Amino acid sequence: MIFALAGNQNCGKTTLFNALTGSNQHVGNFPGVTVDQKSGEVREHKECTVVDLPGIYSLRTYTQEEIVSRDYILNQKPDGIINIVDATNIERNMYLTLQLMELGRPMVLALNMMDEVAANGGSVRVNEMEALLGIPVVPISASRGEGIEELVEHALHAARFVETPAVHDFCSTDDHGGAVH
């Protein structure tokens, strides 16, 4: 099974890729470190391959790196998508999440950097987020290796049983002055 690691720049995709595969791909605290896709087998799950894609904010692309990600997601049709979301900035990440959900592919949301949220005295209501989105939401810390096995199990389950996200229109006509979009 093949899973695409998709998310905004600097959300921890390559750190998660390294944690999943045992690789040592270069990680940087600035956008544009990953400029092409990389793939590797998941440790302890040799039937599972993950593809680390460059950061992308939307399926409407502007940069060459974003085109690489969009084209892989749309044309290669991986068995599932692991959407990595920076838990310290969820709102910024949700635009891409909702676009990915609309594709109707098996998907799991990896809520990364939960250790930073906790260190700053914050919390995330994961169960409520999961109920609202209709997909598994797994809190992780890729840099510490926390929640990684649970994430893999959820991703495999979603792909094996073809759990596709429910299609939601998160905007009502009231949100747009009565206009339908």
Where are the regions a protein language model picked out?
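Active-site-adjacent beta-strand anchor residues
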Residues: 6, 83, 141
